[in-house]
């Protein structure tokens, strides 16, 4: 396959890209409503482990007994809190040994890095409440800044032509997502259609004609085609299935499972829907009514909610889409972004119902960062999500539109 190349070592100057809000972040430490030092396994890098073995002084014993040296991880207590995390949610290692003592994971988080040939893309993860607060509070479309480093580094070689086309595609998709003259669902539909047809060409090994896909979806006929697809009433079954897929994932926080069960009951009624077909129909009708009222409420009391969803879509696509250069899976990464925002919307609807039909900005931040932690802090969960996206295509990419065929040729 053309996108799986022999990996070679090369040296070249690097370009760095960051979102324009990157430098707005500053850790608020003990003032944070949550902690990044619990609920997931912190793996220390080799350099940090070597440094820890050489530590002397009063903190040495604590350090030695708090690390699983065989696995290279920090131990956790019964509540999955890091062994170095104190009751004030501050790091005792940082206090005793200073910032330079931190391992790479702890120094970097919530910064996330994706490596592409001579480009290093740096983002901030919305699994951090403070990052979620910054992004969701941002009204202007996100811009991406690029600068060059004189420092030469080694990287693994890959298919530069496919990567360049993926970068072009990502820019086109982000431009569409940020075109606020169009309704958000239309923007999302256009982006999904582009990603679908892009995937078909990657599968055909027809990378040279990818630019034709971009041109096709600039036409009014393409817009009308996508609008017609969006009007099909199959969203309920799809989103319900996507919601239940979350139970297949590993749990990083013990409270996430009960949270999902409560939300599902509020959204869809009886969880097993073991009642009659008539009762299940009533659940669907109630869901539709609740969703309509929720959208009316959002338009009145949270009119910027579509901007927040736009920012999240741009976040997920900017972070993960170009990773398709390594596995050729462009479409599933876009559907994962869309499904993630759909699930966040469902969780917010459930929270709105639980709050007796009201919602605060803190509810939005809480939902976003908790969802992100469960998905993005687990490689198995990210891999499973992509697998599920391959299995469960949006309905209008099936039936008459076989997944190996392009959308209606405009």
Where are these regions (language model features)?
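Short linear interaction motifs
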Residues: 17-18, 87, 324-327
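Local cysteine-cluster metal-coordination motifs and their immediate loop/turn environment
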Residues: 24-42, 77-112, 125-132
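Ferredoxin-type iron-sulfur electron-transfer modules and their immediate structural context
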Residues: 12-35, 59
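Internal, well-ordered alpha/beta segment that forms a basic, Gly-enriched binding/recognition surface
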Residues: 89, 97-192
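Membrane helical hairpin/interfacial module
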Residues: 40-88
């Amino acid at each position: 396959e053309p996108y799986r190349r022999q990996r070679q070592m090369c040296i070249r100057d690097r370009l760095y890209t960051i979102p324009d809000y990157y430098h707005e972040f500053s850790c608020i430490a003990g003032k944070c409503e949550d902690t990044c030092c619990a609920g997931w396994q912190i793996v220390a890098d080799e350099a940090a482990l070597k440094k820890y073995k050489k530590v002397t002084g009063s903190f040495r014993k604590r350090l030695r007994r708090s690390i699983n040296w065989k696995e290279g991880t920090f131990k956790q207590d019964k509540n999955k809190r890091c062994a170095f995390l104190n009751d004030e949610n501050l790091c005792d290692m940082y206090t005793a040994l200073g910032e330079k003592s931190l391992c790479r994971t702890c120094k970097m988080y919530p910064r996330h890095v994706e490596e592409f040939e001579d480009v290093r893309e740096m983002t901030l993860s919305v699994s951090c409440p403070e990052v979620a607060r910054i992004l969701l509070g941002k009204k202007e479309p996100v811009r991406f800044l690029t600068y060059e480093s004189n420092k030469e580094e080694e990287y693994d070689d890959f298919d530069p032509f496919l990567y360049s086309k993926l970068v072009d595609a990502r820019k086109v998709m982000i431009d569409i997502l940020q075109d606020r003259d169009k309704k958000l669902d239309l923007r999302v539909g256009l982006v999904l259609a582009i990603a679908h047809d892009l995937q078909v060409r990657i599968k055909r090994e027809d990378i040279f004609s990818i630019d034709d896909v971009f041109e096709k979806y600039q036409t009014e006929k393409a817009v009308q085609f996508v609008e017609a697809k969006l009007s099909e009433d199959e969203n309920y079954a799809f989103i319900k299935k996507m919601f239940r897929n979350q139970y297949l994932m590993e749990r990083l926080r013990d409270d996430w499972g009960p949270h999902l069960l409560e939300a599902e009951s509020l959204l869809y009624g009886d969880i097993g829907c073991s009642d009659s077909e008539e009762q299940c129909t009533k659940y669907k009708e109630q869901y539709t009514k609740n969703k309509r009222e929720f959208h009316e409420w959002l338009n009145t009391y949270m009119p910027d909610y579509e901007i927040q969803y736009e920012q999240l879509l741009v976040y997920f696509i900017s972070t993960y889409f170009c990773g398709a250069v390594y596995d050729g899976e462009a479409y599933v990464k876009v559907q994962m972004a869309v499904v993630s925002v759909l699930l966040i919307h469902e969780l917010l609807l459930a929270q709105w119902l639980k709050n007796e039909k009201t919602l605060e900005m803190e509810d939005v931040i809480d939902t976003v960062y908790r969802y992100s932690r469960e998905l993005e802090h687990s490689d198995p969960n990210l891999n499973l999500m992509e697998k599920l996206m391959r299995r469960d295509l949006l309905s209008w990419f099936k039936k008459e539109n076989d997944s190996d065929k392009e959308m209606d040729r405009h």
